[in-house]
Amino acid sequence: MKIHLFLFLTLINVVTYAQELPDSLSLEEAIAHGLAHNRSIINANREIQKAKKEKWKTIATGLPQISSEVNYQNFLEMPVSLVPAEFFGGNKGEFSELIFGTEQNMIGSLKMEQLIFDGSFLVGLQATKVYLNISENLFEKTNLEVKKLITNLYSNVLLASYNIRFLEKNKASLEDNFQEIHQLFRNGFEEEESVEQIQLSLAQINSGLKYAQNLLKIQQDMLKFVIGYPMETPLKLTDEIDDIFNENLYFEPLTDPNNIENNIDIRIAINNVKSESLKLKLEKSKALPKVNAFLNQTYTGNSNEFTFTDSDQKWYGSSLLGLNVKIPIFSSLGRSASTQKAKISLNQAKTQLEETQSKIRIDANAALNEYQLAIDNYYTEKENLRLAERIEQKNKTKFFEGMIQSFELRMVQLQLYSAQSNFVNAIQKVITNKIELETLLNQSKTD
C-alpha cells in the first residue's frame, strides 16, 4: 500500500512538472527560463546565500555565547596522598597514607561569555557587507553573461533555420534546372558538361544542407543546456529572426560608451578596493586591546556510588564573574609587517581598479566601433544579396537562351550562395556585437 502511494505521488509530481514546462519560448521567455534554471546562476545565487550566512556568523561572535559541560569521574583505584605522620601523633620522619574525596564525582558547569570590545569584530561586520556586495556583483555578472549567451544561441538557432531555408530554396531551384537541362541534353540540345555542372552544384548544396541541419540540432541542444531545459524534450522557438532583428528598432543609438560606471567588472573592482581597505583596518585593529566578560556557574556532586540522579544527592555550587583583557604589547614587528603587507594589497587593488576602468573604456569604444561596422556591413551584404539574386536570375535566363555556358552559370550561382551566407553572417555579427556592447555598458533591454 505504501509503495503504491509513493508511486502515485511520484507520478503526480512528474505530471505537474510536465504541465509547468513550456513547449515553446520567445526570446524573453527563454531568458526568463534561463535565469531561473541555469546552473551557473543557481550556484551564483547560492554564493549570495553563503555570504548572508557568513554575515550572521560574524554578527553572532559579538553576541552572548553560552556553553555547558558535564564531567563524570569514577576512580577505579583511589589516589593515595602522603602526609607527615606526626600530624596525627606518629613518629617524626614517617608518613601516613590518606585517601581524599569519594570514588565518584560529577561536575556540571554553565558558562556565558560576552564580547565587550574587539576591533577586529567591528571591521568584520563591515567586511561582511562588502563580501555580500561582491557576491551580488558576481551574481549579476553571471546573469549578464547568461543573458548574452541565451540571446546569441537563440539567434543562432533562428539564423540556422534561416540559412536552411536559403539552402532548400537553392536546392529546389537546382533540381528544377537539372530536370530542364537533363531533358535538353537527352534531346541533344545541351552538352553533358552542363548536366555535370548542375550535379556538382546539387551535391555541394546537399552537403551544405546536411551540415546546416546538423548545426541547427547542435545549436538547439546548446540553447536547451544553457536555459536548463530537458535535452530530450522538443522545444519550439516562437520568435522569428525578423522579430529579434528589426532594423528600425535594432539600430537605435546607444548611450555614450564612455559612460561605464554601470559596468559590472568595474563595480567588482571597486568592491575589491573596499575589501582590501577593510583588511588594512583589520591589521591595524590587532594592536587594540580585546575585552571579554564571562560568568561561570558550577555544581559538583560527590558519592561513592552512582547516586547523581537521586533527588537527595547533594550538590555544591560556585559562581564566578570575570573580565578578560588582552593587550598586545610587542610582536617583534610582526603586526607592522602585516599592516605594511595589507597597504601593498590595497595599492594593488587601486591600481587594478584604474586598469579595469581603462580597459573597459577601451573595450566599450572598440565594441561600439565593431557594432557600427557590423551595421554598415549588414547594409552592404543586404544590397549584395539583392544584386546577386538579380544577376543569378538574369544569367539563368541567358543560359537557357544559349548565351552563356554552364560553367558561367555555376560561378554566378556560387556568387549567390556566398552572398546568402554573408548576409546571414552579417545579421549574426550585428546581434553578437550589440549584445556585447550592451553587456559591457550593462544596458541590456532584456532586463
Language model regions located:
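Periplasmic alpha-helical coiled-coil/stalk elements that build and connect Gram-negative outer-membrane
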Residues: 25, 29, 53, 139, ...
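Small/polar, glycine/serine/threonine/aspartate-rich low-complexity segments that form flexible
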Residues: 20-22, 69-110, 240-248, 294-327
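Bacterial Sec-pathway N-terminal export signals of envelope proteins
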Residues: 18-67, 71, 77, 231, ...
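Bacterial Sec-dependent N-terminal signal peptides
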Residues: 1-28, 35-38, 445-447
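Short segments within alpha-helical structural elements
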Residues: 60, 207-229, 386-443
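Sec/SRP-type N-terminal targeting helices
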Residues: 42-46, 59, 100, 116-143, ...
